[in-house]
């Protein structure tokens, strides 16, 4: 967008992580793209995603033709954003960045409907969570954060997630050996 993002932000305020995630988006835009603007924020409850996201996005795009980015903060919202883009003739011109690494959304990247997705390995998160709980149970110091990395998927690397995309594919697997060795199960 060359620093000229005009954004429709789709949120679900009922979901607890939404508030810090939106604050992070706003802070990042303020620090790194002061000329970018959130034109409209659409709050849709999880149980209404299937009926409310598509018409709300269509309306936002028609009311604000300058919009060039739609951010569904949870990537499963994308399945309702893509039809709105198709119907408004903006599919492929309006960028759709999102978060979670859900396989069908990664396939949307391959199809050109979503521009990028910040993914996380659920398996890696599980290993890190178990490690933290084991440390707590043994009276050991536990890390303050899981320290599980994110992976940014776009058209240049989405094939690493598989065709079709699979959960936990594309993130590497060195963590499995690392945790098993740490726990004394291997080696």
Residue spans for each PLM region:
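Hydrophobic alpha-helical
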Residues: 25, 45-108
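Hinge/cleft segment of the Venus flytrap/periplasmic-binding protein
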Residues: 32, 124, 128-187
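Extracytoplasmic "Venus flytrap"
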Residues: 10-20, 69-75
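Short beta-strand elements at the ligand-binding edges of bilobed clamshell
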Residues: 9-12, 111-123
């Amino acid at each position: 967008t060359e620093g000229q993002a005009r954004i429709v932000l789709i949120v679900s305020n009922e979901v607890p992580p939404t508030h810090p995630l939106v604050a992070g988006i706003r802070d990042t835009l303020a620090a790194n793209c002061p000329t970018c603007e959130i034109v409209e924020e659409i709050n849709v409850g999880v149980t209404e995603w299937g009926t409310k996201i598509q018409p709300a996005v269509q309306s936002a795009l028609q009311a604000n033709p300058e919009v060039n980015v739609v951010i569904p903060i949870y990537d499963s919202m994308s399945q309702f954003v893509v039809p709105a883009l198709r119907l408004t003739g903006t599919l492929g011109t309006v960028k759709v960045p999102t978060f979670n690494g859900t396989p069908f959304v990664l396939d949307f990247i391959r199809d050109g409907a979503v521009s990028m997705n910040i993914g996380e390995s659920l398996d890696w998160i599980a290993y890190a969570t178990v490690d933290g709980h084991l440390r707590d149970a043994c009276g050991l110091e536990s890390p303050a954060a899981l320290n599980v990395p994110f992976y940014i998927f776009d058209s240049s690397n989405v094939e690493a997630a598989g065709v079709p995309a699979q959960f936990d594919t594309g993130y590497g697997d060195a963590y499995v050996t690392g945790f098993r060795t740490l726990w004394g199960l291997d080696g």
